[in-house]
């Protein structure tokens, strides 16, 4: 639920999450999200690919946040309607979903560890969106 709180604070319109392998949305989730679940629609779907296909067909660019690219996240344009794809902690964004994306964004890092946890990465890229839009 921590990502939902971050999404709400960043002004995200909607969060789309897979039905499988994600936390339940219940009273504990509401408490943990600091009320963010009251302010942002959550769409749970069994087939994430179909949801992303619909989003893309609706004119929203899809950008995957992944270390599997050379594109620095600061080089991409988030001023147009954008969907940010975040992967799982273990596997990242699947190759199937990467193919659907209009672009891939990498968070620049200076340390020896090549990745952040999903919660932190979500916050970093969402605040790049805010920076560009303001």
Where are these regions (language model features)?
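Post-transcriptional modification and biogenesis factors for structured RNAs
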Residues: 3-134
């Amino acid at each position: 639920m921590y990502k939902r709180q971050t999404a709400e604070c960043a002004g995200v319109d909607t969060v789309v999450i897979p039905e499988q392998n994600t936390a339940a949305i219940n009273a504990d989730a509401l408490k943990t999200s600091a009320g963010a679940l009251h302010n942002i629609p959550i769409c749970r779907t069994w087939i994430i690919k179909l949801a992303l296909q619909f989003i893309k067909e609706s004119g929203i660019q899809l950008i995957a946040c992944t270390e599997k690219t050379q594109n620095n996240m600061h080089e991409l344009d988030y001023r147009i309607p954008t969907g940010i794809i975040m992967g799982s902690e273990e596997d990242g964004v699947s190759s199937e979903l990467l193919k659907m994306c209009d672009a891939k964004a990498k968070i620049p890092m200076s340390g020896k560890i090549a990745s952040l946890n999903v919660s932190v990465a979500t916050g970093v890229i969402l605040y790049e969106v805010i920076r560009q839009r303001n």
